[in-house]
């Protein structure tokens, strides 16, 4: 079985030690994205998982790709382009204070993906399942068009 996932992965900057964002002088870094998480989980279960996204050409995006590769996720068709990776800021809750997440993803590499940047016919040729979430087409007009194109090809 092979599953293709499509969506945005973001740099997650977390305030350490239950601090609030306005109290910290450094961040814990990791990466987050629903579709990437699904690909990692599937790969951990031994399912062939390919992740499709668009990331800028810089060392932070390289680190992101390395993380996915460490879980045996196929990232061979990740598109490199755009200017920035989307960012989410995390305050982990403590006691009665709940966690808070703040998103900064406007004009990210993924949000500005071109409708025809992905060769969906080739990507989906051997896919048994195509996974995306509702946020993917909601991010921008171009992610909507790219996702719609993939869905139309996958169901035909």
Predicted region positions:
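Charged helix-capping and loop-helix junction motifs
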Residues: 144-149
């Amino acid at each position: 079985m092979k599953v293709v996932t499509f969506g945005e992965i973001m740099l997650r900057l977390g305030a350490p030690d239950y601090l609030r964002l306005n109290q910290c002088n450094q961040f814990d870094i990791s990466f987050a994205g629903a579709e990437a998480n699904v690909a990692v989980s599937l790969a951990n279960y031994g399912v062939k998982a390919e992740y499709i996204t668009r990331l800028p050409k810089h060392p932070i995006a390289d680190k992101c790709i390395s993380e996915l590769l460490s879980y045996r996720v196929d990232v061979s068709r990740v598109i490199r382009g755009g200017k920035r990776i989307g960012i989410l800021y995390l305050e982990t809750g403590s006691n009665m204070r709940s966690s808070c997440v703040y998103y900064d993803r406007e004009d990210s590499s993924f949000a500005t993906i071109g409708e025809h940047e992905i060769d969906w016919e080739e990507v989906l040729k051997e896919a048994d399942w195509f996974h995306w979430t509702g946020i993917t087409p909601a991010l921008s007009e171009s992610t909507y068009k790219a996702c719609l194109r993939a869905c139309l090809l996958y169901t035909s």
